[in-house]
Amino acid sequence: MNAIWIAVAAVSLLGLAFGAILGYASRRFAVEDDPVVEKIDKILPQSQCAQCGYPGCRPYAEAISCNGEKINRCAPGGEAVMLKIAELLNVEPQPLDGEAQELTPARMVAVIDENNCIGCTKCIQACPVDAIVGATRAMHTVMSDLCTGCNLCVDPCPTHCISLQPVAETPDSWKWDLNTIPVRIIPVEHHA
């Protein structure tokens, strides 16, 4: 019994010593990140879709900050992300890449043709935001609220049953411009 307590104490002391060494090393050799890169990375939608030409949102943020890359290449983020980055960097907003005539493209979402889906799960594996649900050899479906329209699920589909379609506008998804709606404050009379 005494040997067990000695072993427990020895392992605990070793864990404490190695933890202290790692804690000291993490502070001593810490690498400071560029705060601008961090801010740009927080603005980007984190869909890791690679439509901008970079393998993910973090490398794209680094390219914008360090290499002067265009701020208009994020397709899932669209105009809203581009405008936030332009405001952060204090630069002129640019038309979205490849869409010089239209600044606000329609939001696209993946749609699966349920009659042709064979349940191979290749689209589920390709989706960077887990917007597709389903099981092997069962029909899959896309959760449109989570879909970023990154187009990464379309190519892996062996039956070509996935397509991108614009999201239909509903009163809930419509972007109301509340500044143009006339509002009048009606005074309320208090009766005692």
Curated annotation (Swiss-Prot):
Give binding positions for [4Fe-4S] cluster 3.
C127, C147, C150, C153
Binding residues annotated for [4Fe-4S] cluster 2, in chain numbering: C117, C120, C123, C157
Q: Which Pfam families does UniProt cross-reference here?
A: Fer4_21, FeS
Where is this protein found? Answer: Cell inner membrane
Q: Which cofactor does it need?
A: [4Fe-4S] cluster
Which organism is the protein's source? Shigella boydii serotype 18 (strain CDC 3083-94 / BS512)
Keywords attached to this entry: 4Fe-4S, Cell inner membrane, Cell membrane, Electron transport, Iron, Iron-sulfur, Membrane, Metal-binding, Repeat, Translocase, Transport
**What GO cellular component entries does it have?**
plasma membrane
Q: Where does [4Fe-4S] cluster 1 bind?
A: C49, C52, C57, C74
Spans annotated as Hydrophobic: 1-26
- BP GO terms, sorted: electron transport chain
Protein family: Belongs to the 4Fe4S bacterial-type ferredoxin family. RnfB subfamily.
One Gene Ontology molecular-function label: electron transfer activity
Identify the NCBIfam families for this entry: PRK05113.1 (NF003475), rnfB (TIGR01944)
Protein name as catalogued? Ion-translocating oxidoreductase complex subunit B
Q: What does this protein do?
A: Part of a membrane-bound complex that couples electron transfer with translocation of ions across the membrane. Required to maintain the reduced state of SoxR.
Q: Which gene encodes it?
A: rsxB
4Fe-4S domain: from which residue to which, for each copy?
32-91
Domain 4Fe-4S ferredoxin-type, by residue range, is 108-137, 138-167
Q: How is the co-factor bound, per the entry?
A: Binds 3 [4Fe-4S] clusters.
The Enzyme Commission number assigned here is 7.-.-.-
